Amino acid sequence: MAAIKIANPGAEVTRSQAALAVNICAARGLQDVLRPTLGPKGALKMLVSGAGDIKLTKDGNVLLHEMQIQHPTASIIAKVAAAQDHVTGDGTTSNVLIIGELLKQADLYISEGLHPRIITEGFDVAKTKALEVLDEIKVQKEMKREILLDVARTSLQTKVHAELADILTEAVVDSVLAIRRPGVPIDLFMVEIVEMRHKSETDTQLIRGLVLDHGARHPRMRKQVRDAYILTCNVSLEYEKTEVSSGFFYKTVEEKEKLVKAERKFIEDRVQKIIDLKQKVCAESNKGFVVINQKGIDPVSLEMLAKHNIVALRRAKRRNLERLTLACGGLAVNSFEGLSEECLGHAGLVFEYALGEEKFTFIEDCVNPLSVTLLVKGPNKHTLIQIKDALRDGLRAVKNAIEDGCVVPGAGAVEVAIAEALVNYKHRVQGRVRLGIQAFADALLIIPKVLAQNSGYDLQETLIKIQTKHAESKELLGIDLNTGEPMAAAEAGIWDNYCVKKHLLHSCTVIATNILLVDEIMRAGMSSLRD
């Protein structure tokens, strides 16, 4: 009897081989769900929520977040894969597939009597060697636009169809290059992704400026301003209650009127400072003037600004204030004391676009903007969500390539090369540990196998072709998914991120090792006691 049964007779216990079988079964089950989604030719999954909302996706990270996974082992694997996406932005599906395959290959040896500890030691040796091989085959490149286009296209084609991927590729690369500054880490939050349910997904475009999801609040304000000064501020232009508990008291009507006039004058003085600055900078030109405020602007203030041809937007999102100053220049001011021309940014064109009841304000033609906007268009909600998920992965792929300073060939070439290196290396290792190395090598081949299978080719035949040609030529060969034949991935411009592959090898080995060493599963928490 298990020791926990003595302390808690109601506990559920699974031991030894049964525990291992349960864990491997859970990992294989999760692998089977994600297996058909790998690669550019992968299948889509339709997710239907409890409320009836539909989401079509083949993004592993989205699937793992949206699915309700109850099995504890499958849940652990899902969290590890989701962490992979959080750290590197890609490799979620590959993570689940390799973990499942590592456990499957280990199970073959364990069923013949090999102890799990021996297998895990082999996995650790194999991981160390695999990382050495990965460092040898990585390609150091100057990250020019052409290479980044290939990296982005490789990532995006696994998320959306090829025609759309080609359109998104240029937008993604140009947006990262726009916000890139020498010696400063790339901040992808400076790329705003804005949805517009309009036209088709192929109309998605890069705006070298900002798109705000609201418009001006006064009918007399101009809908289009060219060559405009931009004042970004966080100053209230309406009467607000005090932040502390306080009040003003009056005894007569005259005193009340004085209070009202004083409150009004307080706001009007602030508005007048904006008007004075506008008249100063635009006195001898036809330049426009736009005020974008995080706080409110009351109707009287809007009327004053409209009379002087000033376009004013209120209640702008806080995150857009930083983006505005980076895109247009100038400073975000919290007070109108000492307001000067140095505080102003500039945009070549500011215009309002109405789409049904929604309004959008475009701020374009900025000089060297350090913040840009990806305007996602599509006919329906699930298309917009799918494109947004793809764009995030594409942006991360380009960022990773720039920060790594190197790339690795894709299309399964890395896995084939590492697997062959491990098979050759195992003969230099003494004892049964070499069986763990062989299991690791076989598990990595799940990636080229599934890529071939999802493209409609025989997985074993395709793999043998690649391995044979790789052994002869020593080139890094992947699978041409259009023909099923071996191809030089580097020549075809198919590049993966080095950091994704490195993180993948680390995380897969660690989680597979931990699962193999579980010999008892106990469900004896407070919730099961109450049950």
From Swiss-Prot:
Keywords: ATP-binding, Chaperone, Cytoplasm, Nucleotide-binding. Testis specific. One of its GO terms (cellular component) is chaperonin-containing T-complex. It is found in: Cytoplasm. Pfam families: Cpn60_TCP1. InterPro entries: Chap_CCT_zeta (IPR012722), Chaperone_TCP-1 (IPR017998), Chaperonin_TCP-1_CS (IPR002194), Cpn60/GroEL/TCP-1 (IPR002423), GroEL-like_apical_dom_sf (IPR027409), GROEL-like_equatorial_sf (IPR027413), TCP-1-like_intermed_sf (IPR027410), TCP-1_chaperonin (IPR053374). GO terms for molecular function: ATP binding; ATP hydrolysis activity; ATP-dependent protein folding chaperone; unfolded protein binding. Belongs to the TCP-1 chaperonin family. Component of the chaperonin-containing T-complex (TRiC), a molecular chaperone complex that assists the folding of proteins upon ATP hydrolysis. PANTHER family: CHAPERONIN. Component of the chaperonin-containing T-complex (TRiC), a heterooligomeric complex of about 850 to 900 kDa that forms two stacked rings, 12 to 16 nm in diameter. This is T-complex protein 1 subunit zeta-2. It comes from Mus musculus (Mouse). The gene is Cct6b.
